[in-house]
Amino acid sequence: MPHPSDEIKLLIESNSADVLRLRRRIRETFALRDKSPSKLQEWRRACEIFHSRYDELAFPGGYHGALDRLVAGDPYTMEAAICFLEIRPYFFRSGYMFDAMLRKAKRAPLNPEQRARLQIVVDEFKAWKAAKQLKKVSEGSV
């Protein structure tokens, strides 16, 4: 039987792919924007579309206000935040979102299952940071 969060995770992954696609379109049109007025317009339109859709794609229910909703205990936002942290999507500004969401999730009124899932994320993140630091030390860059 699928977990209730599976649908949210699929949405996050799909939205992440859309953000990457829209961002790629900006880069493609940027390279040609000085070639003609129509190319400039294509680039402007790509930017406009990206910025108009980013908030809704970045996080289920919209990223604007999501951290406040998380700490306030909104059930959907709490589940979506845990899902986001578990899959750690990669797109424009997602790393900053991950850090902010992780900090806020620690203070959110999560249920016991969500709290356990968050602890796994925290433990994996600490291990990743330790491995990253160890690599820096072994390369002599610290």
Which residues does each predicted region cover?
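Extended repeat-based scaffolds of very large eukaryotic assembly and lipid-transport proteins
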Residues: 1-142
